[in-house]
């Protein structure tokens, strides 16, 4: 075989290797050149910027104030978190109310709904070991202090609400009057006592300007509607597992939002379609119970929910205490 043939084949092989290495870069160069030419031809925006934009004359959003798990009467000491007692609770609630009032005024909110989502009190005899050891007050004192604190919160929010103010509450597992859950009487709950007191005050014209949701026939659940959204409120102590819980409450209507408490930390879960399950925080936060079970060191919090008619969007604001 002649040297010419060998040299020619070698050159061809080298050229093939060079082309093989350069080919991907050539495609990239062609792509970038084409993109530059395409961008030069864009004269108008792709999006129709005027579509769907309307200027509202006034704010039609409504506010839902979410309160839960105050556990009035419970106390513990902790050098890192500051512990918890009734005085600390009052400071945290006042901080939350101040934030709520500010949001109402700045956003020009007219209509407000307040839900208390259970466990107003701590109780004194829910455990075989003496629960009263960790409490500041008797059961009756816990109930009266809880009622007065709720009235104070409602009145402060009422003072800055120009439209409708609605209040509703449900009972939690700590609110049952019987300590042993296996011996409880259905509806025999602190929430009934508080609701009945507030309604009686209204009848005596001592607590006016507030619409109270009267669910005394079943204090464990509220079914309500805000901004054309069906809302169900339940403490959540009977809801187990990380599954969709809204279908469990559907009977003759579908609910858009499920609001629960009980677990003492904020959690938001999207269920089917645009349905939301919102778990409200607690004013306690991390405590000795959390420490024993190696649970998360959650900060105390309560939530504000902003809803808008004719929109599936929700805005949830967490106020850390």
Model-derived regions, located:
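Core catalytic region of metal-dependent phosphoesterases/phosphodiesterases
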Residues: 50-70, 82-201
